[in-house]
Amino acid sequence: MRTLYIDTSSSYLYSAIVEDNNILGEIKEEYGQSLSEVALPRIVSIFNDNNIKPEDIDKIIVVNGPGSFTGIRIGITIAKVYSWSLNIPITTITSLEAMSLSSETAKYHVPAIDARRGYVFAAIYDKNNRQILKPQHIKIEDLKQEMSSLDDYVVITNDEYLDEDFDNIEAYNPNLLKIVNYYKDKEPINPHAINPDYLKLTEAEESKMN
């Protein structure tokens, strides 16, 4: 079984093609604001470098948020086009769960993404990936309160701005093989039903409400 994984929910592109228990090709690169321009060509390069055709993919897993609003849309669009045009089953995973799955260093995992203005996108999972606190847009101080009862935790993030707010920081380094193997048997979703899960309103939506 060959699975294509796509995560463009941050300034990084994380993508891989996994066959059974082997990574055939992967990308873990930071592109910043140029991600929208390079995401598709770099994903195509994984196919080309490994002599794999898109129609050889059996499953697609795409991160649907939270994170960068623009980035999330890019990854979802690419994944949906592959899925719909080639009739490839597709499913989603949250960026926070992917972050949690990639850590092995503590009893509790607290993936956190800077959401500005004193907020983060965050969740809490135990080491067996059982959800303790559901993914949400939460004040940093409120998250600290939720964490106060945890006896052994790590905060997983790639946002250096959060280093001042939390102890026990671990830089996010995605374990793409583990993520894919954990989710490859998840029930597929109609590609037309897949939408970004921002966990908060966009700034444009917030402006309309004010």
PLM regions and their residue ranges:
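Conserved short-loop catalytic and cofactor-binding motifs
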Residues: 27, 66, 187
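A general structural signal for well-ordered alpha-helical segments in protein cores
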Residues: 36, 40, 75, 79, ...
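Oxyanion-binding and handling regions
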Residues: 1-22, 91-210
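Residues at secondary-structure transition points
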Residues: 30-38, 69, 73, 77, ...
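Buried hydrophobic packing segments
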Residues: 43, 78-82, 100
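N-terminal beta-alpha supersecondary unit
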Residues: 1-62
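DPxDG-like acidic metal-binding loop motif
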Residues: 59-90, 95
